[in-house]
Amino acid sequence: MYFINPFKGLRPTEDKASSVAITSTDQLSKDIVVNHKKNNPWSYLNVFAAENKLKSKEQFELMKKSSILTKDNNNSFYIYKISTENHEQVGIIGVAKLSAYDNLHIRGHEEIYFERAQKRLKQMDNLNAQIGPIYGIYPDNSELTELVKKEINLNPIYSFEALDGCKHEMWIVDEENKVKEICNLFNTINCVYIADGHHRMEALSKLSQFKKHQNPNHTGKEPYNYFMVAIFPQSQARILDYNRLVKDLYGYSTKDFIKEIKKKFIVEKQKNLFKPIKPQTFGMYLDKAWYSLELRERPQPNLFHIINLDINLLHYYLLEPTLGIGDPRYDNRIDFLAGYHGLEEIEKKVDSNEAKLGFSLFATQMENVISFADKKLTMPPKSTWFDPKPLDGLVA
């Protein structure tokens, strides 16, 4: 058995792929979601957003019965390219044993919301399928890169622009010698890092354990022992800033709040919106004005969970002690805004009174992700926004 394996994917017909596969709803407005569901009856949105479990299952089964979704005959790898105007990344979709996650050959870096993981578990259990891949990162491998380059010179089975504004293309690799070569090359890689899909990963692990205990004839070869992963080279992964919005000043006036945070930060008013270009520097938007914030003193070197992670620095030195923000997973006074929205969205949210103030952060770096994962540490939720992301439903 290999580290990463081929599989017989369940996928949409070529003419239906663009209407079946979906972008994460985290990236879409409610209006776009409603219109897409209405105009694309075969979209997976009509499975995930069905009124109940039964309707969801019925819709999924109907898509298979109607041959909107068909299963490949051969064990295959799927080469997957995502392109924007200024970025592209090419990965491979395969399956890995869940034991690789449990044994830390596949490593996560973020805390999860228990309720969200449970929702994912129930959804996959109901459909008896994994519709969207875990998004993984592997250390660059020149031989894999060359192999992939050759394959993408051929015509793709899918090529379309999705609701996320990205171009998505896919190629099938099912020739036995090429499949074996990919398997062997992945066997030289020590570990894969989870970029996105921590809740899905935890749900898959729990679901696999449940099904194992329910099956008296368990062999370890059943499909529930595996999970689907889209793996991209580390050098091609892109992390955007993940910014914060806070509902109120925790009883402070603007003047007193700024006076208080000046005890720990150098605070300077800016003429324009402020996007940090180095670690341990933050932007703050409050009362129609931008400020730069820089820590007066570097944190103690023994506090590893704080060092080099701006999200923790902001929390421990400002959000928690001054604004009273507790665990960001459950505190409804804080919200999160991915960097692809732009800092103008912070201004829009604050100016419309959806939030009292916003903070712009320097993006978490890939070396931070790897360092935390290797040390079995976790970052707070919403620490990284990998962009672009794989679609759900191109292959299941």
Walk through the language-model features, giving the residues of each.
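Surface-exposed, charge/polar-rich loops and edge strands
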Residues: 1-396
